[in-house]
Amino acid sequence: MSSEDTLQVQQYGPWAVIAGGSEGVGAEFAALLAQAGLNLVLIARKPGPLQTTANRCREFGVEVRELTADLTSDKSIDEIISATADLEVGLFIYNAGANTHSAEFLDGDLADFQRVIDLNITTMMALTQHYGRAMRDRRRGGILLVGSMAGYLGSVRHTVYGGVKAYGRIFAEGLWLELRDHNVDVLELVLGVTRTPAMERVGLNFDVPGMRVADPAEVAREGLEHLAQGPVHVAGGNGVDVARRNDPDRARVVAGTHRMMQRLLGLD
């Protein structure tokens, strides 16, 4: 980041909390913030990648705390709040929003769908409220919530996931309105297809002709650069695709995007 960018990010210090900060876009957020001089609390489920990212960030001379937590569990909320109680958190990034249960709705398990809701809504809301209150009192800070283009229309096997992602965008827009007069920035960073370990594990076909595949480092940089602008930024040059997904002819746009998704997943 340039010195100008560093100064912009420094207003969100001295500590940043990144939920989902071990790999992919989350790890790139961590590296950029460490370069800018922010201390970090990195939260993830897998200790191995978490430690690797933490050590990478320590090379920039910042303090890094690692916290292994299952963000689908309500116990994680109290654990995270307790582990950061002594810190002045000026930036909260919620990057933990994967689809943990990909199944057609009538065939899926409700308990598994509930975990998708808890990961993407329940835990996100609780932590956002906790850190957001302190930021509002200090009259400075930033909240960055990572969203998905899946939240712009319905999709087979993403019925619940698409719904929670739509919720996240509307939530961010409302929170942005509530906090903008308190000098607290709010942004939902909307991701399209991004070459992350999580998307690779799902088995996405990145070689579909015409598919736009974003780089995690560039996506993270876009998010930090647009944080002060809020409330929503579509990453990876996908703005035109998102506009198309808002077409009022819902049958046409949903069916058309479904065909593209089938190719992306190698199911056509």
Where are these regions (language model features)?
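Conserved glycine-rich cofactor-binding loop
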Residues: 15, 22-24
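Conserved glycine-rich Rossmann-like NAD(P)H-binding loop of the short-chain dehydrogenase/reductase
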Residues: 36-53
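Conserved mid-core segment of classical short-chain dehydrogenase/reductases
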Residues: 78, 82, 91, 97-114, ...
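C-terminal helical subdomain
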Residues: 188, 204-245
